[in-house]
Amino acid sequence: MEAQAQGLLETEPLQGRDGDAVGSADFSSMLSEEEKEELKAELIQLEDEITTLRQVLSAKERHLVEIKQKLGMNLMNELKQNFSRSWHDMQTTTAYKKTHETLSHAGQKATAAFNNVGTAISKKFGDMRYSIRHSISMPAMRNSSTFKSFEERVETTVASLKTKVGGTNHGGGSFEEVLNSTAHASSQNASAGSRQTKDEELQC
């Protein structure tokens, strides 16, 4: 059974090819000798016309190249022009316009975000500088052990100077009072020294 089916499969293509050949033979056999001659003449004419058209096309292409060379249009310029034209056509499409608008909007958002970050950083540095200056001038610093030690030494030194100069206030005082007293005592000492110098000059 399988051998018979295979035989049928093998014979069918052959029968089809034979049918085509028979059809061609039948079609050509239907033409008369006069019609065959007319078709052959028409075939020759068509081939001649195609050859002539190819020659004309080749001549036109050569003439086109000559004109472009005279106008200074080379292949690179043509490519640039084609690219520019294609780019312009692409920019006018709706998809490109939507994409361009989306990217522009995103760029504006990014720029605004960077500006906000820069402003925040500048403000933070300004607050830090103010905090440092404020902390230096705060009373808490004057209450530190280092500043108190320095203040006590200054008061002690000034008190000893006042004792030598002849001041009456030996009770210390605040740091500002000590500084004022020292300045006053120094001016008195300078005045006494100048009077003593004048007296010596008069005695001479």
From Swiss-Prot:
The keyword Cytoplasm does not apply. GO terms for molecular function: protein homodimerization activity. The modification Phosphoserine is found at S29, S86, S122, S131, S149, S174. Keywords: Coiled coil, Methylation, Phosphoprotein. GO terms for cellular component: cytoplasm; early endosome; perinuclear region of cytoplasm. The modification Phosphothreonine is found at T146. Belongs to the TPD52 family. This is Tumor protein D53. It comes from Mus musculus (Mouse).
